[in-house]
Design a protein with these regions (language model features):
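Bacterial Sec-dependent N-terminal signal peptides
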Residues: 1-22
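N-terminal regions that are enriched for targeting/export leaders
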Residues: 21-81
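Active-site signature of cysteine proteases
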Residues: 21-22, 215-461
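Post-signal peptide N-terminal segment of secreted/secretory-pathway proteins
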Residues: 67-139
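Second-shell loop/turn segments in exported
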Residues: 77-89, 151-157, 307-315, 324-325, ...
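Stable alpha-helical elements in mature extracytoplasmic
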Residues: 87, 95-96, 100, 162-171, ...
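Structural recognition of the beta-strand scaffold that forms the well-ordered cores
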Residues: 93, 119-122, 168, 177-180, ...
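Papain-like cysteine protease catalytic cores
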Residues: 117-250
């Protein structure tokens, strides 16, 4: 039986285009050399005993790494309360709403307020469902093994996202206070909802392709798509609740005095209290050293709404990005930012430093890839959005450390914030969204370039 499995594996590798080198396996001689390479001396035994009983990070932790990291910052925009995305991938939505909340509370002298993430998530999932189904219609003439079609079926819907999704969502659907539409189990723990929607969409997508293959007209496909979206809408309503079309809300000032009581639609509420032109007033920047700087890139199919905008960004060196970040914080504006947050992040104390964990010493090896190499090999990519809110500068005006407002609840030594070294930021910041008024004119002109279109399955995305 084992021999049959091995033969089948070799056959599948050959059919996939991999030439099987008869010398490529681990033979007895090589295995002997590998065994001999492990010393198993007193030092190895001590490390092995410790690792068998403890988490790797607990033993690799560098207790001195936190030295110099504190809450003293040259420029800091105070947080308006720590939010908690819980077991969901909605960091992008929490971050976008947190940036907006900071501005609204300051401009309107409001007390504590939080906007409903569940409301905007409802429409995010509805829009993403439509994006997938319409893509199935648009690509119906392509063979099923086409790379785009395969990618669509592999990724019918996600709970994650990025800033252009926020811009399209809020501009179209507005916002509501959290008191109007609160969290549910499935908004706070999205895994099962995502699985149900993915299964529903894959089946519906296959049905649309079958209809198209039999010669169905576009009008018939569009009508069928709408019926399918009715099923999606029902699933979302049952799990997240009915999104309000209007609501009555009492505005108070920071002292608790009533300012007004009005009835709003979500769009009216957004226009009156936010009014931000998220689509046109903000620019997304990326630090991707694996690609040419000072160029504009666009990711195909990387949008939340079918009639929305693909993800576009200007690729810049970190020094350029940090200058704009400092200027924004100087002027009291938080920023949407995204990171490879899992690398060298100490969740217990809320710090991010390249010195937090010494894996090299623990395992007697080195991990030497630079940022570009990590991107190219899929070792590093943006995984989490957070709100950039503070920077500390040295005597020469150079950044030493930064702080972000996270959305994992009030945890760690900094009450839900993460303090990071400038070196860590250089390695693991990927995206920053900046208001145009803090972007130099020569950088802003780069937007006029024709974007370089990247496929949805690009290694970084």
């Amino acid at each position: 039986m084992k021999q049959l499995l091995i033969s089948a594996l070799l056959l599948s590798m050959a059919s996939a285009g991999f030439a099987v080198n008869p010398k490529g396996g681990i033979d007895d001689a090589m295995l002997g050399r590998l065994r001999s390479s492990y010393k198993n001396d007193a030092n190895d035994k001590a490390i092995s005993n410790a690792l068998k009983s403890n988490d790797i990070n607990a033993l690799a932790a560098n207790v001195e790494a936190q030295n110099g990291l504190d809450e003293n910052f040259t420029y800091r925009v105070k947080s308006k309360g720590i939010t908690n995305q819980k077991s969901s991938g909605r960091c992008w939505l929490f971050t976008g709403l947190n940036v907006l909340r900071s501005q609204i509370m300051d401009q309107h002298d409001m007390p504590q307020i939080e906007f409903s993430q569940s409301y905007n998530f409802f429409f995010d999932q509805l829009e993403k469902s439509n994006l997938f189904l319409q893509a199935m219609i648009d690509t119906a003439k392509l063979p099923e093994d086409n790379e785009t079609v395969q990618w669509l079926f592999a990724h019918p819907i996600q709970d994650g996202g990025q800033f252009t999704g926020i811009a399209d969502n809020l501009s179209k659907y507005g916002i509501v206070p959290k008191s109007v539409m609160g969290e549910t189990f499935s908004s706070s723990a999205t895994t099962n909802l995502r699985k149900i929607l993915s299964r529903r969409l894959r089946e519906d997508g296959l049905r649309l392709r079958e209809m198209a293959a039999k010669g169905a007209k576009e009008s018939a496909l569009m009508a069928e798509k709408e019926k399918m979206l009715q099923g999606v809408y029902r699933i979302l309503t049952l799990t997240l609740g009915v999104p309000p079309t209007e609501f009555t809300w009492t505005q108070k000032d920071s002292k608790g005095n009533i300012v007004s009581t009005k009835t709003y639609t979500p769009q009216q509420f957004y226009k009156e209290f936010a009014g931000n032109d998220l689509k046109n007033d903000y620019v997304m920047f990326m630090n991707d050293p694996s690609r040419e700087y000072y160029k504009v890139y666009e990711i195909d199919y990387d949008r939340h709404n079918y009639d929305g905008s693909n993800w576009k960004y200007i690729n810049l060196p970190m020094e350029e990005i940090k200058k704009m970040a400092i200027e924004s914080l100087k002027n009291g504006q938080m920023m949407y930012s995204s990171w490879d947050s899992g690398k060298f992040l100490n969740r217990q104390n809320g710090t991010a430093s390249l010195d937090n964990y010494d894996y090299d010493s623990l395992f007697g090896t080195t991990f030497g890839m630079n940022k570009a190499e990590r991107i190219r090999t899929k070792d590093s990519a943006s995984t989490h959005a957070m709100t950039l809110c503070a920077v500390d500068l040295d005597a020469n005006g150079q950044p030493v450390k930064w702080m972000v407002e996270n959305s994992w609840g009030p945890v760690g030594d900094y009450n839900g914030h993460v303090v990071m070294t400038d070196d860590w930021m250089n390695e693991y910041l990927f995206r920053l969204v900046v208001n145009k008024k803090f972007v130099p004119a020569d950088i802003l002109k780069l937007q006029n370039q024709k974007p370089i279109l990247l496929p949805a399955w690009d290694p970084l995305f």
